[in-house]
Design a protein with these regions (language model features):
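Short acidic-glycine-tyrosine-enriched beta hairpin
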Residues: 54-65
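Glycine- and acidic-residue-biased ligand/ion/polar-headgroup-sensing regions
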Residues: 35-49, 91
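A short beta-loop-beta micro-motif enriched in histidine and acidic residues
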Residues: 27-38, 80-82
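Short proline/glycine- and basic residue-enriched helix-capping loop/turn segments at helix->loop/beta transitions
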Residues: 14
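Basic/polar phosphate-binding segments, predominantly the helix-turn-helix DNA-binding elements
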Residues: 171, 175-193
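Conserved short histidine dyad/triad with adjacent acidic residue
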Residues: 18-31, 66-72
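Single conserved hydrophobic/aromatic residue that forms the stacking wall/gate
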Residues: 1-11
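Compact structured core domains
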Residues: 72-172, 181
């Protein structure tokens, strides 16, 4: 059925769900490694703030998009209790869900209201009402599946290229990749952005 096919496509594109919840020490630093992945973060209570002064300050009960990270980042806790929940997508895993070019969003944190993505602040509020992590995951997956059904524009060559990259764990030379997807390198680069 459509839902099971949709979830299979969702699972291929996401890396993991994660939750940061607890009572950290005041001023505790959390280092974030650059991994090229993108995240949606739902603040389900107080949050850890970004150390960089020019960055967006995240507010409780909101949702945020974090673009592909290519440099280290640090979060600092200033609250007694923290609760953040997120979904991490593999590189290029969002091309079916967002209309913005991800290359322009590298190393940025923006409100999902500004990103035009599939999630919004009302989802963060609904996630707060879910008592268990599995319930939160089910709610997010229903949003993702619905988005796949409404945005059925599939770039088969790009989807195939992403699968090849993931299968080779990023070790496939570009020349081999463009030959596999039957595109010239320049056209491939334009489509991939």
């Amino acid at each position: 059925d459509v839902e099971s096919r949709g979830l299979g496509d969702v699972y291929k594109r996401q890396d993991k769900y994660w939750e940061f919840k607890g009572n950290p020490d005041y001023g505790m630093k959390i280092n974030i490694l650059p991994d090229g992945c993108t995240d949606f973060i739902f603040t389900l209570g107080e949050v850890a703030d970004i150390a960089e002064q020019e960055s967006l300050i995240m507010q409780p009960y909101r949702s945020y998009f974090v673009g592909p990270m290519s440099r280290y980042s640090t979060l600092i806790t200033y609250a007694k209790s923290i609760h953040m929940f997120g979904i991490r997508f593999l590189p290029c895993g969002l091309f079916r869900f967002m209309q913005l070019p991800l290359e322009e969003l590298g190393n940025q944190r923006i409100s999902t209201f500004e990103s035009g993505g599939i999630f919004n602040d009302s989802l963060a509020e609904r996630l707060c009402e879910q008592p268990y992590i599995q319930d939160k995951i089910r709610l997010i997956e229903s949003f993702l599946t619905q988005a796949l059904c409404t945005n059925n524009k599939i770039e088969k060559q790009i989807s195939y290229a992403v699968d090849c990259i993931n299968l080779s764990k990023g070790q496939l030379p570009i020349r081999s990749l463009v030959e596999n997807v039957c595109l010239c390198q320049r056209h491939f680069e334009r489509k991939f952005k």
